[in-house]
Amino acid sequence: MPNASAHAGPAASREKVEVLFCGWGQDRVLGSLADNGSSLLFEYSALALLGGSPQGARPKVLVQFDPASRAVSSRAQGAGAPWPLKLQARGEHPEVCAIEFAYSVMARSCGLAMPAAQLFPINPQLAAFGVQRIDRVAGMRVPVHSLAGALHADFRMPSLDYKTVLRATAAITHDQREVQKAFLACVFNVVFNNRDDHAKNFSFCMTQGMEWELAPAYDLSFNVGPRGQHQTSVMGEGLAPGRSHLLALAKDCQVPQKFALGCIADVCAEADPLGPLLGEAGVRKRTQRTVMAALQANLRRLG
């Protein structure tokens, strides 16, 4: 089986969705978003007052969130830790937030390092997905370097192969265990059809020992990709990467075959539970069918 230090395998117990959902009837900050509806959702000047940014595909708000008390504050000195909240974009159904939440649960089940995550169902028309910031620990800033920045790669267009991702990970971290983590991330993206895997969605964090390690996963969700392809190809294959491509990648980057086979088997075994999880999270049935059909096609290529 794969080395447990680099691949934890399926979690002993997946978090129950209802435990991680939060109600916001008494929340002043998110309640104001709900009261104003979509008009505020797309008002970037209003979001900026809460620390938001118009950058990226979806509007964001930076808040202080305390999971224990469920208190949310727009003040930097508020209780809890800094959490970016991502809301659906114009014309999107709030289920996009539920899908990203479900993917965060599945990523953790598959052994990927994930920051704490929450789904915030604000009202029937409005939702948010939030994660704890990976560049803050105990109030201190953690140096983070994106792969796009390290390689001067244009994240706006497909420009990388996972061979480059793994080799860059080896060069930056000097740790083959981190390379194995990057391989696991590749397998997850292939199986779960996360094709928005561009160069800016891989990063490295500096440890207290002044060493670089692969950052926790982020921006994981179902995505069909540009023209149906992965932004980052797998040994040259972006449209339909399969078992042979993943094993060739492992061999090229000195990932032990036993570890690679274990990763593929474990992640594939975690695909089916996504269906019920999407339903619990409130994803529409037709969307569930679309997502699971894509995953089944991916599983057939990896069998």
Question: Where does each model-flagged region fall?
Answer:
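A glycine-rich phosphate-binding loop feature that marks nucleotide/adenosyl-phosphate handling sites
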Residues: 121-127, 187, 201-207, 266-268
